[in-house]
Amino acid sequence: MTQLLQVYPKHKVLEIGTGCGYQTAILSILSKRVITFEVLSALSTKSLKRLKRLGYDNVDFHCADGKYGCVEEAPYDRILVSAAPISIPDELIKQLAPNGCMVIPVGSLYDQFIHIISKDKNGQVHIKKSTPVRFVPLV
């Protein structure tokens, strides 16, 4: 998913689903700034402590439901979602910057595919359905 996202040093990245923080650390190395959301309090706290201890200082942690993104910090050059909604959330597309890219698993529990959503410089949205996957639901 990270490779599909094509993150560069100038990018501001929204990550939904911090998890253990592994993906967050990779995004932190590749980008200028990461805004990450984790809905599970214990997981969020552990990830925050771990990544701060390791010196990842360009990450803003939020223990909250990130399924609607974070309008206050938008627009984002890249958005990575690590849980699967039934359909692509319009709220996230609206927060994608021109020339931005979002990688997100989409579908029901047993019928999910990675989707690569790009927005061109004019704001036109393009959606490409990719690899079959299985992620936890984005609730």
Language-model-detected regions and their locations in the chain:
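C-terminal substrate-binding/catalytic core of Rossmann-like NAD(P)-dependent dehydrogenases/reductases
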Residues: 137-139
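Conserved histidine-centered catalytic loops in small-molecule metabolism enzymes
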Residues: 126-135
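Conserved nucleotide-cofactor-binding alpha/beta core module
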Residues: 6-122, 126
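SAM-dependent Rossmann-like transferase core, predominantly class I methyltransferases
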Residues: 2-4
